[in-house]
């Protein structure tokens, strides 16, 4: 077993000594062959020069700007008729959200070292241990989701709403609190 591990340990060094692994490989192409078709462009100084712009006199520049302004189309803003009243939308938008903190419990698993001894020979092994961590979590609550949840709750647990409006909420308070958050 020792001989096999020593053989595997020194195998890369032996292959390197034989020249199978060359540390400085030659480039795949000779340097003089690459980029020969660019030499004319690089040596020509006018290749990269852009034509110079001559500034226009202020009169021409103003005339050009006024022509541009004339060509723009004017779209009037929509106006309401005097008799119509625009109402606010009843559905909340996607931006009606807030962050809400709530207590939460998370379960983590960690590996705890555990010392074990057999006949005066001690070693450590890792034992998986679960840790219960009580934290304050944050969630984003949007008004749209709250309305949908309230609608679902009202449809699914209609007796909670009926009993709450009739004043008999205490008789089913526990069931309604579990299902919909209370009366």
Curated annotation (Swiss-Prot):
Residues where Pyrrolidone carboxylic acid is found: 18
Location in the cell: Secreted, Extracellular space, Extracellular matrix
Disulphides: 153-183, 160-176, 169-180
Numbered residues of crosslink Isoglutamyl lysine isopeptide (Gln-Lys) (interchain with K-?): 20
Post-translational modification as stated in the protein's UniProt record: O-glycosylated; glycans consist of Gal(beta1-3)GalNAc. Forms intermolecular disulfide bonds either with other MAGP-1 molecules or with other components of the microfibrils.
Effect of residue 79 to V: No change in glycosylation levels
Residue(s) carrying Sulfotyrosine: 47-48, 50
Domain of life: Eukaryota
GO CC terms: extracellular region; microfibril
GO terms classed as biological process: embryonic eye morphogenesis
Phenotype upon changing residue 50 to S: Loss of sulfation
Keywords: Disulfide bond, Extracellular matrix, Glycoprotein, Isopeptide bond, Pyrrolidone carboxylic acid, Secreted, Signal, Sulfation
Oligomer status and interactors: Forms a ternary complex with BGN and ELN. Interacts with FBN1 (via N-terminal domain) and FBN2.
Similarity remark: Belongs to the MFAP family.
PANTHER family: MICROFIBRILLAR-ASSOCIATED PROTEIN 2 (PTHR16485:SF3)
General function of this protein: Component of the elastin-associated microfibrils.
Protein name: Microfibrillar-associated protein 2
Gene: MFAP2
């Amino acid at each position: 077993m020792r001989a096999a591990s020593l053989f595997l340990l020194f195998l890369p060094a032996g292959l390197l000594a034989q020249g199978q692994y060359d540390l400085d490989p030659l480039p795949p192409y000779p340097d003089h062959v690459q980029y020969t078709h660019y030499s004319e462009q690089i040596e020509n100084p006018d290749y990269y020069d852009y034509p110079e712009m001559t500034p226009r006199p202020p009169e021409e520049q103003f005339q050009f700007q006024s022509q541009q302004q004339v060509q723009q189309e004017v779209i009037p803003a929509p106006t309401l008729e005097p008799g119509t009243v625009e109402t606010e939308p009843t559905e909340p938008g996607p931006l009606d959200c807030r962050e809400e903190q709530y207590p939460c419990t998370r379960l983590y698993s960690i590996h705890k070292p555990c010392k074990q001894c057999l006949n005066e020979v001690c070693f450590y092994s890792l034992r998986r241990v679960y840790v219960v961590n009580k934290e304050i979590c944050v969630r984003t609550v949007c008004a749209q989701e709250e309305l949908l949840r309230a609608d679902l709750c009202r449809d699914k647990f209609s007796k909670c709403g009926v009993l709450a409006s009739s004043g008999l909420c205490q008789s089913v308070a526990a069931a309604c609190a579990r299902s919909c958050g209370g009366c």
